[in-house]
Design a protein with these regions (language model features):
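N-terminal hydrophobic/helix-forming segments and targeting peptides
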Residues: 1-440
Length: 440
């Protein structure tokens, strides 16, 4: 498969994942087709050497694992990404009537997006809806496959400051227009009910989010770029999933994690700071008939690749990045490092993962923020509060992070799959952070 084919598959993966709930459904489809067995958290687990399994939490986070056949002295090799992206959530009472005959939606920010990128483009909604069905309450996925909303800008004639650093007020400026007389109040819930084939009065709860309807594409004179909504972080979710499914390792339990709520801090029951990963690893250990002490031995030898995209050198603002620790699109995978531990990378984990990449000739780039810029954190250092393991922060270089339409390099998607597959297939033997053997 060449870079264009991989990029087009990535675009399809993202288009089938308009919300975090749909992201997990898409990932489950890949796993089901690859022969994985679903293990509900609420049921007893039957875990065997050589088996392939996955479990989900809240239908928005997923952990999958492949058990090797030689589990005498085992450990975990893990990749973690996230299923969510910055957007706007529709409030429970969704409609704002007026002025005049306008009908608008009442929304609030989910995460730290670039607000103005959401204006003047066709939008829709996606997520989950909880519906009464007799004595049961059932969860249903919703995606309105139609252009139904726009957040209109104010004409420059009425807002002369729009090009002079105008600050958008999310309560006033960012309410999507739903109708101008054709629909009456109550139309939104009726639309949702009609789409699901239920009665509006049977809808008891909604987690619905705005979706950018713009299609992803490969572009450039030499087809060197891929642009799409949600590259952060579905590009990493995609590449780590492809590598995980393709790889085999007889002496490791390979683990794939895709957590929800990274964009709002991860401090939820299904986020990276939850007990989800710890719970799953303990249950794997128990299923293999191992003791508690053997579990802690395995954790001491475990390695995590925290997968979240990185900021590429900007063509118009090179001054925003460090003078030498900057990265470029199509330049290879990125290892991110931060002295204040916003990223998990240290010398040991950098050396280990660089060695893995060198084994398959994947170029490695180094990213650090400018010393006068406070960068964001991601999954690895947060999940380590629950499961403390050696970890590296990995990503792919992209532009316009947290825009509703982001840009990355086509080569890097392939680089990442190759590197992460090599990681999963390598028996990473860690000895107390003093040495590591990378054997296959």
């Amino acid at each position: 498969m060449n870079t264009i084919e991989i990029s087009n598959e990535l675009i399809q993966f993202i288009e089938s994942s308009p919300s975090m709930f749909h992201s997990i459904k898409t990932i489950r489809t890949y796993l089901d087709e690859a022969g994985f067995t679903y293990l509900p958290e609420s049921k007893a687990w039957d875990v065997k050497a050589g088996g392939k399994y996955y479990t989900i939490r809240n239908h928005s986070s997923l952990i999958a694992f492949k058990v090797g056949n030689d589990m005498d002295s085992y450990h975990f090799q893990m990749c973690a990404s996230h299923s969510d992206s910055p957007t706007y959530k529709v409030k429970n009472v969704p409609e704002l009537a007026g002025p005049n005959e306008y009908l608008r939606l009442d929304v609030e920010a989910y995460g730290g997006m670039i607000d103005n990128t959401w204006l003047d483009r066709p939008l829709t909604v996606a997520g989950r809806v909880l519906v009464r069905n007799g004595s049961k309450i059932e969860s249903k996925l919703l995606y309105i496959d139609k252009d139904i909303l726009i957040i209109p800008n104010v004409a420059i004639h009425f807002n002369r400051e729009v090009n002079n650093g105008y600050k958008y007020n999310r309560q006033i400026d960012l309410c999507p227009m739903f109708s101008c007389g054709a629909l009456k109040k109550g139309a939104f819930d009726k639309m949702v009910a009609d789409e699901l084939g239920v009665k509006a009065e049977d809808i008891l709860g909604k987690d619905l989010f705005l979706v950018n309807r713009q299609k992803g594409l490969v572009w450039g004179l030499e087809n060197e770029f891929v642009s799409s909504p949600k590259l952060d972080d579905l590009q990493c979710a995609f590449v780590s999933l492809k590598a995980f499914i393709e790889a085999e390792n007889e002496k490791s339990v390979n683990v794939y994690c895709c957590f929800d709520n990274e964009e709002v801090g991860s401090n939820t029951k299904q986020g990276a700071m939850s007990t989800f990963l710890k719970d799953v690893l303990h249950r794997i250990n128990a299923g293999l008939g191992k003791t508690e002490d053997e579990y802690y031995q395995a954790i001491a030898k475990t390695f995590l690749v925290s997968c979240d995209n990185a900021h590429a050198l900007h063509p118009n603002h090179a001054e925003k990045t460090d003078a030498v620790n900057f990265v470029t699109m199509n330049g290879g995978i990125v290892i991110k490092e931060s002295a204040n531990q916003k990223y998990t990378t240290d010398a040991f984990s950098r050396a280990l993962f660089t060695g893995v990449c060198q084994n398959v000739n994947v170029p490695v780039q180094s990213f650090a923020n400018r010393s006068d810029v406070v960068g964001g954190s991601t999954l690895g250092n947060l999940s380590n509060t629950q499961v403390s393991v050696h970890a590296v922060d990995f990503g792919l270089a992209q532009l316009a992070m947290h825009s509703c339409f982001e840009t990355a390099g086509v080569k890097d998607t392939e680089y990442a799959i190759v590197a992460l597959k090599e990681f999963y297939e390598t028996n990473v033997q860690i000895e107390e952070a003093e040495s590591v053997c990378l054997e296959k």
